[in-house]
Each structure stands twice: as structure tokens, then as C-alpha cells.
Amino acid sequence: MKGIIYLEDGTVFYGTGFGKEGNEFGEIVFNTSMTGYQEILTDPSYAGQIINMTYPLIGNYGVNESVNQSKCVYAKGFIVKNIDENPSNYTSEINIDQMLKNMGVVGVFGVDTRSITKKIRSYGTMKCIISNGELSIEELKKMMDASNIVDDYVNTVSTKEIIHIAGNGNKVAVMDFGIKNDIIENLKERQCDITIFPYDTDYNEILNINPDGIFLSNGPGDPKSIPEAIENVKKLIGKRPMFGICLGHQIIALASGGNTYKLKYGHRGGNHGIYDVQRDKAYITAQNHGYAVDEESVLENGMIITHRNLNDGTVEGMKHKSIPLFSVQFHPEGAPGPTDTTYLFDQFVNL
């Protein structure tokens, strides 16, 4: 089955198709992780995107449903150099090709993924069509011209109903913008009594459960695309201790009077270095975001920068000077990636 990667600038890469047969449009991004392809695919933050893996060998240890970060794959496509259809791992249940077929995801392998990555780094994230169907280049061009990138997927990935997970510890209200399972597991490990709310839940309904703390989850797209959530968070700030991760971090910035902006090609992978200003220590972290917090705008609104990216100096963490409010851009839960910064969950429950 022929596979095609058609980029916004007209560049075409030919490979072999796998997974679901079809044609999908999305924003192409690259991920630098060497492992964790299953967690990456099932991370709701990739909604609407086509993931290009820089590491050349994908699928070596198979697929085990227990490590999925959500119930399905929201990404539009998956690009790899080589796939292993005969994995060797005692926990493996199916191979990567079967996973993509089961989840309805178009895949292409056998292309130069490093070349694609260099192009994204030079050009920035761009529109892309991934195809293993029967469309010609001319038909793919027409599809490209008629399509636009959408940065509002939170409504798609957020829970549609309130979910309660009983625990014996602190009562935590979670605003779900596309939460990963391992974040929930970290809260459960700390005995939290968890109530997960849809992203657009009114602030009064959240306060009605009398939570000890409020957690803002990760999620896909542009934080400015969900103004209703920003307005609710504005009204919640200062009412209870609050902690945000990834998209939740950006929403806290906006709700506090700060600003966010789109990065040229984002940070995605399990090997991103950050500096913890308060601990005077560097950590390797998992990251997955295309937007960042504008530093000056949050400093003007009572924030202190707590973490910085060691590659480009962007804001990776902040806290308020006088109220129990903090957030980080990276993923302390890893999944996939290091878990050296899970102390942040302890910091939250101890506020």
C-alpha cells in the first residue's frame, strides 16, 4: 500500500502505508522520544495533528492497552521511518500496525523522518496530508487548498459528564481539557478524592463540591480558543489552591491577565531539559505543546518564574507571589518520559 506525505509547501515524501487506509489532513509536528509511541498516540493533546517520530525504530516492543493515556487516538496520522510488525515483549498484545487499524489512524513508514523534521524546524509547523489511499498528487493538492488547521479540539477530548473517583485524601476538582490517565494515577497515588469536570463547567458548580484544590489538565490546541474556560478560571483563582499542567498552565496565564503565543515548531518529546530556578537544579522532562506563556505579561500580573526551558529559555513554570497558585508547561507525570518532577503533585496536595 503506497503512502504519501504531502506538505503545505508542496514537498512530497513517498513511503508505505500502514494502519487505517485513507487520507487525513492535519498540522504536522515532530516528537523526539525514543520510546513511548503508544502513550504519545493516545495523548489527547495531539488531537488534530500528524505526528512525525524522529527516532527511526518504532513498534519494537509492541502495544499493551494498559499504558494508553486515553480511550482512543485523537491524532490524525503517524509517520515513522521503520516499523516492527513482529515485536518482542512479554507484555505485548498487538503490533503497532494493528493498533492504528483498531484506532482508525492513517500511518506511513519508510520515509526520511529526519528530513521532514529539519523542514519543520526551518519552516515551522505546517499543514499536511497523510495518505495511504488512492488519491493522486493533484487531488491531494486540492484537498490541501480546501483545508485549514483547527486549534480548538478541547470540546472533542474533554469528558462530557462529571466523573467521581473516590479517595481518602484531599478533595480535588479537575478541569478536564484532555487529561492523560497518568495524571489521574498520580493524584490517586496521593489518595486524592477526584471529581473530573467538563472543560466548560461553570465555576459555581466546581465550588459547590467544596474542593481542597483545583487542578487544570493538559489538552490540545490554542488556549485562547476556549474563552469560557478562561473566564471560569478567573473566578476560581484565589478561591482554592490551584495547579495547572501544559494547557492548564497556559489557561492560568491568560486568566491571570497574561498572554500566550504560538511557538515556531513546539516542544514535543521525552528529553527536554528544564531549569528549576528555586531548586537550582536541571531536570529532563516530557513535553508536548505548541504554545508558550509570554514571560513579561505574567510578571506584570503577580507571577514569579519557577522553571525555564534550557533550549530556548521559554517559561516552563510559574507561581503567584501571594496566593496558592502555580503551574508548569512540562509533564511531571511523564508517560512517556522522565518522572523526576512528580514532586510537583506533592507540592499541590500540601498547599
UniProtKB/Swiss-Prot annotation:
Q: Which residues form the Glutamine amidotransferase type-1 domain?
A: 171-351
Reactions catalysed, semicolon-separated, are: hydrogencarbonate + L-glutamine + 2 ATP + H2O = carbamoyl phosphate + L-glutamate + 2 ADP + phosphate + 2 H(+)
Name a single GO biological process: L-arginine biosynthetic process
Got any disulfides in this one, which pairs? none
Keywords annotated in UniProt? Amino-acid biosynthesis, Arginine biosynthesis, ATP-binding, Glutamine amidotransferase, Ligase, Nucleotide-binding, Pyrimidine biosynthesis
Q: What is its EC number?
A: 6.3.5.5
Question: What Pfam families does the entry give?
Answer: CPSase_sm_chain, GATase
Q: Which NCBIfam families match?
A: CPSaseIIsmall, PRK12838.1
What does the subunit comment say? Composed of two chains; the small (or glutamine) chain promotes the hydrolysis of glutamine to ammonia, which is used by the large (or ammonia) chain to synthesize carbamoyl phosphate. Tetramer of heterodimers (alpha,beta)4.
Protein's name in the database? Carbamoyl phosphate synthase small chain
Q: Which organism is it from?
A: Clostridium acetobutylicum (strain ATCC 824 / DSM 792 / JCM 1419 / IAM 19013 / LMG 5710 / NBRC 13948 / NRRL B-527 / VKM B-1787 / 2291 / W)
